[in-house]
Design a protein with these regions (language model features):
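Nucleotide-activated sugar donor-binding and catalytic core shared by glycosyltransferases
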Residues: 1-175
Length: 175
């Protein structure tokens, strides 16, 4: 969960609602929490993470998973058809679809983004978060709006051929 630039009291209320939902969800789910980015308001979220970890020992807290561990976790969730991603990060919108990982997008931080159908939007409200979790556990395979096909996949290769030497090494990347 990342801070959202808005009124500090509203932001704290939203964060409190999310952490109340996490407390409830921890009864039946293994929870891994990562630290927020460093936007204004991050320290309040970190304090909530520390507090929930003290109260619920089974919750795992990781300051930063890193790309490989994060993508491995998404892959595990998608492959085993157990679990989901929850938060307000753009990675939940753009990356989880590649791993068939259901995602609960909390709040309005990602409102302007194109969202695949594995993403379910919800307000930062404990009861709404809990009720929307049931919609996530279907693990259907959805069309990926971010996947390029046909001639679009050739664009990077064509750029390299036109502007670089023949011995230039083009590294294929994934998100």
């Amino acid at each position: 969960l990342h801070p959202v630039v808005k009124d500090e009291n509203d932001q704290r209320k939203d964060v409190d609602e999310v952490f109340e939902a996490l407390k409830y969800l921890s009864k039946d789910n293994q929870i891994i929490i990562t630290y927020p980015n460093f936007d204004p308001g991050y320290q309040y979220i970190i304090n909530k993470i520390i507090d929930i970890k003290k109260k619920i020992k089974d919750i795992k807290v990781v300051k930063h998973l890193g790309g490989t561990n994060y993508h491995s976790l998404l892959h595990y969730i998608g492959k085993n058809k157990k679990g989901f991603c929850m938060g307000n990060s753009s990675s939940g919108i753009k990356e989880t679809i590649f791993f068939n990982c259901p995602t609960l997008n909390i709040g309005d931080r990602q409102n302007s983004r194109l969202k695949p159908k594995n993403v379910v939007d919800v307000k930062a409200n404990k009861n709404q978060i809990i009720s929307k979790i049931n919609k996530l556990n279907n693990h259907k395979v959805y069309e990926n709006p971010y996947k390029l096909s046909g001639k679009f996949n050739k664009i990077p290769d064509e750029i390299v051929k036109k502007f670089f030497r023949n011995d230039f090494k083009f590294k294929k990347c994934t998100i």
